[in-house]
C-alpha cells in the first residue's frame, strides 16, 4: 500500500531549519550515489546498413576506437559534406546551388554550404559503442543503473548480450535499470541511432542540421550507479515563500519485489515511511527558518537538503538544491516572490559550434549567461530544445531565468502521437530539472498548432505550479490565451478575440517613434512576452572565421567572404561590419525601448543576442555565434536600453528645424533590485563635444518597481542653439548607473539653396549632364531609378532574418560615410546610418558602381546584403573630361524631407567652393558604363579564384563612437 505521510505529523516531527547556501556550485540532484565513470576510450563500429541488431554485434568485440563523452562526427567518423548529403532540414537548404556565382562551392572536395555552418563530417544512422566494465565486490546485491546524461538519439543497451530497455528522450538523461550485476568483469554495448524518428518536423533544433543538431554520440556524465534494491527515484521540492517552508515529494522505487518500511531522513531528522512491492511515495513539509532568503536574479540564494531512505533493503540518499521562490501572475502581470517581474530574454537553440553538442559543464553555461547579463538581459528562451542540467545549475547560481521547450517544432492534437511524445518529454523535463529555481517557464514547442496546448498547459500547471506554462511559443492563435495557459509568447494578437495588433515591429512603425504596443493587449488577461523580437541582420566581420576551430566549419561565412572579394568590397570589411552593426543596434534600441514603454507587456524574447548560423545564416546578434562581443557595441552600451533600470523618452521625431521645440515626456522602466528612494531624475542635451547646451532635473521622489513611471517633461527651444548640429538627449537618475540617450539633429530653416546660385547644374538627365560636363561645368546628377542597373532599393531598417530565406526582404545593411569629406561638412553625421538618414534613403536605389574603376571610393557607400556584396554608392564624385561630377542616389528635386534639404545644401555649398576637386577621373565611356553596363558583366564571378586573403592584415579602425 502506498503511504503518504500526513503533513501535520511531519511538521510536528521536523522542526529544524535548512541552512542557507550561498550562490556557489552545489551538487546536482542526481550526484549523491556511488558511481563509476565510463569516460575514456571505447570500442566502436559504424553500422551504415543497420545490420548490427540482427547480426548480434552486441555479442561481438568491436574493433574501431572512439572517446566518450564525445560524438563520432567530431572524431573523424562519417562522410565528407557533398552535394547529396542527406541533411535533416527543410527550410531552404536546396536551391542555392542553382546560383552560378556559387558554382565553385558545389565541386567535390570543395562543397561549402552558404545556408548554414556545416559539420566536418556528417552521418545519419546507427553506431555501436562498447567497453568492458568491472563491478566492484561492494556492489553485490545492489541494483545497478546505466546513466547517460545526453545521447542522440535512440539508445539501446546490452550487458553480456542481454538487452535492456531503450531510451529516446531528447531532453533528459537516458537511464537503464540493469538490475543486480554480479561483481566482476562484464561487457557493455550501446547502440545509438541518430536518424530522424517519431515523424518530427525536421527543423526543430533538437534534431536538425540547421545548427548542427544531428550528432551521434553520448556526452556529459556516463556512469554506472549503484543503489539499494529500494531507492529514492525522485525528490521534488515545492517551496512556499509565504510560509517559508518546503514540501518534499519523494518517489520510492522497489526492485526487491517485497513490501517494506523504513525511515525517510532529512538532514538527520527521521520520519516513518512504507512502500509496497511496486514502490511508494511520501510527502514531507519542512520549515526553512524565518531568516530563509528568497531566490531571484539579484539574490540567487540556494537552499540545500539531503534526503535519505533507510529500511528493509533500502539505503539511498539524494542531495537536492532549490530556491525559495514562487512565480505567479495576475491579469497581464508576472510576479516573482510577490514582486512584479519583467523578462528581458534572448533566444538560444542549445547550439555549440566548437563541440557540436550542448555543453554539460557548468562553467560553459556560466560564460554564456554572464554575457547575457552584461548586456542587460535576465533570461533565455530555448527554441525547440531543453538544455542539460548544467545550464539550469549555472542559471540558479547566477540568477537567470529559463524558459525551456519540448524538443519539437510540431503541432499537437488531442490523442495524437505527437501529444503522447510531448507528455513523455514533459514528464522527463519536470523530473530532472523541476527543482531548479531558474526554471520558471515551459512551452511545448516553437510556433506549434493543434488543440492540445491548453489541455497540456492546464494539466501541467495543476501538477507542478512551480513554473508557468504556455500553449506554444510564438503562434498568434486564440488558443494561446485560452483557459489553461498561464502566459503566452506572441508576435501579435490579431487572432485574439477583441485583440488585434503588433507586439513587435521590424519595419519601424509608430511604436518606434515614442509610441508603444499597448492597444494590442486590450483584451488579453494573461502575461504576454513579445516573441522573437528583432531578427535584424548586420554585415559580418570575416575575422570571425578564424574563431571556428572545432566541429562546425563556417562554410557560410567563407562563401560570403569569397563573394566580397570577388565584388571588390573585402578591403572595407571592417568599416562595413562596424557601420552595419551600428545601424542594426539603432533598430534594436528603437524596438526594445518600445517594448519597455508598453503598459501590460511582460517582456521580450529577442532573436537574438548572438548570431544564428542556420536557416540561411541570420547574423542577427550583437555578439557573434561563439558569444564573443562585436566591435560596434559593448555590453554596457546595450544595457542602457535593455537593462533592469532604463529611462525612456517618448520622442515623436528626431530631426528638427531650428524654429521648432524639442518636447518629450520621459518615464522610467524600473525592474532593478529595489525601488529607488529619494531618486533625482535629470536630463541634459549635449553636443558632439560632450558639453551640455541645456539641462535640468526633476524633484526627488521614490520610484517604485514597474514600468511607465513618470519622470517629467523635456522642453528645449532649438532656436537658441547653433544649427546644423547633432545633439544628444541624455536622461538618468543621479547616483545610479541608470542612464539612456538619444541622438537628435537640428537644421536651419534657411537650408534651402538654388543650384544655379551655387553655379551647379542639377539634373535627372544623363544626356544633359554629359553636355554640361563636356563644357567644363559642375554637375549634380540625380539618376532616375529606371536608369540604374542592378541597383537595389534602400530601406530604413536592416535586413530581416536573412535574404536567402526571405529573398523579397530589403537588402539594406547600412551606410558607410566618409565623415571627413567636405561634401558632408554641413550635414552632421557619424559614419553609419542613423535616424537622420533613414527616411532620407528609404526606397532610394543605391547606385551599383561595379562598372566603374576600382579606384572609385564613394563618399557614402551602401552596405549590401552579405549574400551578394555588390559595390554600392549613395554619393560619389569624379572628374569627367573637363567637368566635375557629383552623383547622388537621393533625388532632391521636389523633396520636402528635412534631412534631404540639409544634405542638398551641404553638397551645393561644397560644389560651389574650391574644395570640389574630385580625385578620380572617369572617361566618358567609364561614366556611361555605370548607368548602362551590367554588374554581372564587369564583376568577377564568385566562381573565379579569389585574391589572396591575408588573415593577419591590419584592419582599418572604425571611427570612435
Where are these regions (language model features)?
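Substrate-binding/catalytic cleft of secreted carbohydrate-active enzymes
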Residues: 369, 379-622
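N-terminal carbohydrate-binding accessory modules
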Residues: 236, 306-372, 744
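Catalytic beta-strand/loop cores that center a nucleophilic Ser/Cys/Thr
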Residues: 785-793, 801-899, 915-960
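Short alpha-beta junction capping motif
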Residues: 757-802, 882, 907
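Beta-strand-rich binding/interaction modules
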Residues: 157-159, 245-275, 282-284, 305, ...
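Accessory beta-strand-rich segments of carbohydrate-active enzymes
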Residues: 45-47, 79, 95-109, 118-231, ...
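Accessory carbohydrate-binding/adhesion or oligomerization-edge regions at the termini
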Residues: 28-110, 191, 195-198, 907, ...
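Extended acidic/polar, glycine-enriched regions
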Residues: 180-185, 251-329, 720-752
Amino acid at each position: 500500500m502506498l503511504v503518504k505521510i500526513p503533513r501535520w505529523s511531519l511538521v510536528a516531527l521536523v522542526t529544524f531549519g535548512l541552512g542557507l547556501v550561498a550562490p556557489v556550485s552545489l551538487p546536482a540532484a542526481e550526484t549523491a550515489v556511488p558511481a563509476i565513470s565510463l569516460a575514456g576510450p571505447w570500442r566502436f563500429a559504424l553500422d551504415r546498413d543497420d545490420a548490427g541488431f540482427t547480426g548480434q554485434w552486441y555479442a561481438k568485440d568491436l574493433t574501431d576506437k572512439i572517446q566518450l563523452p564525445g560524438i563520432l562526427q567530431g572524431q573523424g567518423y562519417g562522410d565528407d559534406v557533398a552535394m547529396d548529403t542527406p541533411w535533416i532540414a527543410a527550410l531552404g537548404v536546396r536551391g542555392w546551388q542553382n546560383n552560378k556565382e556559387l558554382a565553385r562551392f558545389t565541386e567535390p572536395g570543395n562543397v561549402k554550404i552558404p545556408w548554414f555552418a556545416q559539420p566536418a563530417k556528417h552521418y545519419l544512422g546507427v553506431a555501436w559503442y562498447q567497453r568492458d566494465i568491472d563491478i566492484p565486490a561492494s556492489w553485490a546485491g545492489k541494483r545497478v543503473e546505466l546513466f547517460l546524461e545526453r545521447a542522440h538519439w535512440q539508445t539501446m543497451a546490452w550487458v553480456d548480450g542481454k538487452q535492456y530497455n531503450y531510451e529516446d528522450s531528447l531532453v533528459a538523461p537516458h537511464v537503464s535499470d540493469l538490475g543486480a550485476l554480479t561483481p566482476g568483469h562484464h561487457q557493455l554495448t550501446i547502440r545509438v541511432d541518430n536518424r530522424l524518428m517519431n515523424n518530427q518536423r525536421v527543423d526543430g533544433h533538437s534534431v536538425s542540421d540547421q545548427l548542427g543538431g544531428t550528432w551521434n554520440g553520448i556526452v556529459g556524465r556516463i556512469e554506472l550507479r549503484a543503489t539499494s534494491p529500494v531507492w529514492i527515484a525522485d525528490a521534488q521540492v515545492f517551496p512556499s515563500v509565504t510560509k517559508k517552508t518546503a514540501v518534499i515529494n519523494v518517489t520510492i522505487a522497489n526492485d526487491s519485489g517485497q513490501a517494506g518500511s523504513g525511515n525517510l531522513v532529512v538532514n538527520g531528522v527521521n520520519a516513518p515511511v512504507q512502500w509496497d512491492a511496486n514502490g511508494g511515495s511520501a510527502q514531507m513539509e519542512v520549515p526553512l527558518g524565518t531568516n530563509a532568503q528568497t531566490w531571484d536574479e539579484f539574490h540567487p540564494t540556494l537552499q540545500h537538503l539531503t534526503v535519505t531512505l533507510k529500511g528493509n533493503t533500502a539505503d539511498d540518499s539524494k542531495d537536492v538544491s532549490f530556491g525559495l521562490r514562487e512565480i505567479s501572475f495576475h491579469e497581464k502581470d508576472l510576479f516573482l516572490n510577490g514582486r512584479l517581474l519583467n523578462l528581458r530574454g534572448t533566444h538560444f537553440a542549445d547550439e555549440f559550434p566548437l563541440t557540436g553538442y550542448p555543453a554539460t559543464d557548468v562553467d560553459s553555461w556560466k560564460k554564456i549567461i554572464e554575457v547575457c547579463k552584461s548586456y542587460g538581459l535576465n533570461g533565455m528562451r530555448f527554441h525547440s530544445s531543453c538544455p542539460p542540467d548544467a545550464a539550469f545549475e549555472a542559471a540558479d547560481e547566477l540568477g537567470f531565468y529559463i524558459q525551456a521547450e519540448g524538443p519539437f517544432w510540431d503541432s499537437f492534437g488531442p490523442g495524437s502521437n505527437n501529444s503522447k511524445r510531448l507528455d513523455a518529454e514533459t514528464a522527463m523535463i519536470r523530473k530532472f530539472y523541476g527543482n531548479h529555481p531558474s526554471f520558471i517557464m515551459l512551452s511545448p514547442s516553437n510556433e506549434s498548432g493543434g488543440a492540445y496546448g491548453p489541455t497540456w498547459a492546464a494539466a501541467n500547471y495543476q501538477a507542478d505550479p512551480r513554473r508557468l506554462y504556455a500553449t506554444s511559443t510564438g503562434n498568434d492563435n486564440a488558443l494561446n490565451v485560452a483557459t489553461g495557459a498561464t502566459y503566452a509568447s506572441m508576435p501579435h494578437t490579431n487572432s485574439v478575440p477583441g485583440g488585434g495588433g503588433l507586439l513587435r515591429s521590424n519595419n519601424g512603425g509608430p511604436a518606434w517613434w515614442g509610441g508603444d504596443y499597448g492597444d494590442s493587449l486590450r483584451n488579453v488577461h494573461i502575461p504576454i512576452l513579445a516573441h522573437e523580437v528583432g531578427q535584424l541582420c548586420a554585415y559580418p566581420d570575416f575575422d570571425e572565421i578564424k574563431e571556428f576551430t572545432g566541429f562546425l566549419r563556417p562554410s557560410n561565412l567563407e562563401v560570403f567572404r569569397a563573394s566580397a572579394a570577388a565584388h571588390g568590397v573585402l578591403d572595407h570589411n571592417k568599416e562595413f561590419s562596424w557601420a552595419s552593426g551600428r545601424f542594426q543596434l539603432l533598430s534594436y534600441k528603437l524596438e526594445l525601448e518600445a517594448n519597455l514603454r508598453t503598459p501590460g507587456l511582460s517582456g521580450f524574447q529577442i532573436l537574438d543576442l548572438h548570431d544564428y548560423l542556420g536557416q540561411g545564416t541570420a547574423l542577427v546578434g550583437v555578439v557573434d555565434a561563439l558569444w564573443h562581443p562585436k566591435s560596434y557595441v559593448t555590453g554596457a552600451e546595450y544595457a542602457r536600453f535593455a537593462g533592469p533600470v532604463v529611462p525612456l523618452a517618448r520622442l515623436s521625431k528626431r530631426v528638427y528645424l531650428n524654429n521648432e521645440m524639442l518636447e518629450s515626456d520621459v518615464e522610467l522602466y524600473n525592474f532593478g533590485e529595489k525601488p529607488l528612494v529619494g531618486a533625482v531624475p535629470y536630463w541634459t542635451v549635449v553636443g558632439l563635444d560632450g558639453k551640455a547646451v541645456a539641462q535640468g532635473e526633476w524633484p526627488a521622489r521614490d520610484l517604485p518597481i514597474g514600468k511607465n513611471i513618470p519622470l517629467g517633461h523635456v522642453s528645449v527651444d532649438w532656436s537658441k542653439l547653433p544649427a546644423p548640429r547633432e545633439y544628444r538627449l541624455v536622461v538618468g537618475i543621479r547616483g545610479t548607473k541608470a542612464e539612456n540617450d538619444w541622438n537628435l539633429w537640428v537644421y536651419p530653416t534657411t537650408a534651402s539653396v538654388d543650384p544655379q546660385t551655387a553655379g551647379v547644374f542639377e539634373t535627372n538627365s544623363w544626356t544633359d549632364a554629359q553636355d554640361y560636363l563636356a563644357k567644363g561645368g559642375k554637375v549634380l546628377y540625380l539618376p532616375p531609378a529606371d536608369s540604374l542597373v542592378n541597383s537595389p532599393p534602400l530601406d530604413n531598417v536592416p535586413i530581416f532574418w536573412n535574404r536567402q530565406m526571405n529573398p523579397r526582404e530589403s537588402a539594406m545593411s547600412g551606410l558607410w560615410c566618409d565623415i571627413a569629406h567636405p561634401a558632408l561638412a554641413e550635414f552632421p553625421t557619424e559614419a553609419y546610418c542613423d535616424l537622420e538618414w533613414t527616411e532620407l534613403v528609404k526606397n532610394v536605389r543605391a547606385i551599383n558602381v561595379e562598372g566603374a574603376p576600382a579606384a572609385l571610393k564613394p563618399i557614402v557607400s551602401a552596405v549590401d546584403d552579405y549574400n551578394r556584396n555588390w559595390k554600392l554608392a549613395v554619393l560619389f564624385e569624379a572628374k569627367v573630361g573637363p567637368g566635375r561630377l557629383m552623383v547622388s542616389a537621393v533625388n532632391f528635386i521636389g523633396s520636402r524631407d528635412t534631412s534631404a534639404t540639409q544634405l542638398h545644401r551641404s553638397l551645393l555649398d561644397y560644389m560651389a567652393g574650391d574644395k570640389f576637386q574630385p580625385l578620380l577621373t572617369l572617361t566618358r565611356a567609364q561614366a556611361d558604363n555605370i548607368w548602362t553596363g551590367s554588374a554581372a558583366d564587369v564583376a568577377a564571378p564568385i566562381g573565379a579564384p579569389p585574391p589572396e586573403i591575408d588573415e593577419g592584415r591590419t584592419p582599418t579602425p572604425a571611427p570612435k563612437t
